[in-house]
Amino acid sequence: MPTPSMEDYIEKIYSLIETKGYARVSDIADELFVHPSSVTKMVQKLDKDEYLIYEKYRGLILTPKGTQMGKRLLERHALLESFLSIIGVDPSHIYHDVEGIEHHLSWNSIDRIGDVVQFFENHPDALKTLKAMETNKPETKE
């Protein structure tokens, strides 16, 4: 199993490849706000663990294992953003909150959250009831 840090890299690499068609060490460093040398070390580890194939100065490609994991991690992130949005979390907090919790939930928990999101998507009246509950509560300050 990849560590939370490895997951962040795999997710970002997958996202870059999906949007740009490639992911370079410098792109990954810019996106994750880390030094290129840190990216190189992690990319070498991900290569060793068979999530990607890395050749110095030539770039990297995700293996099928890395592609599958990257897709799953990106979907997890999007699902958690949807869930937090549905339950009424302030949009300005959603990204940060997802970053804080995504590595601490089991895949079983993620699947159950997916069920909740799907329920509210399929039952707009239930979503209206939830939103009504939200508007009847006093606002909390942070």
UniProtKB/Swiss-Prot annotation:
Any one Pfam family match given in the protein's UniProt record, by short name: Fe_dep_repress
Gene3D superfamilies: Iron dependent repressor, metal binding and dimerisation domain (1.10.60.10), Winged helix-like DNA-binding domain superfamily/Winged helix DNA-binding domain (1.10.10.10)
Family designation: Belongs to the DtxR/MntR family.
SUPFAM superfamilies named in the record: Iron-dependent repressor protein, dimerization domain, Winged helix' DNA-binding domain
Name listed for the protein in its UniProt record: HTH-type transcriptional regulator MntR
Activity regulation statement: DNA binding is strongly activated by Mn(2+).
GO molecular function: DNA binding; DNA-binding transcription factor activity; manganese ion binding; protein dimerization activity
Binding positions (Mn(2+) 1): 8, 99, 102-103
The keyword Transport appears for this protein: no
Any one GO CC term of the record: cytoplasm
Function, as annotated: Central regulator of manganese homeostasis.
Residues reported in the UniProt entry to bind Mn(2+) 2: 11, 77, 99, 102
Classification via InterPro entries: DtxR_MntR_Metal-Reg, Fe_dep_repressor, Fe_dep_repressor_sf, HTH_DTXR, HTH_tscrpt_reg_MntR, Iron_dep_repressor, WH-like_DNA-bd_sf, WH_DNA-bd_sf
Subunit (UniProt): Homodimer.
Segments forming domain HTH dtxR-type: 1-63
Organism: Listeria monocytogenes serotype 4b (strain CLIP80459)
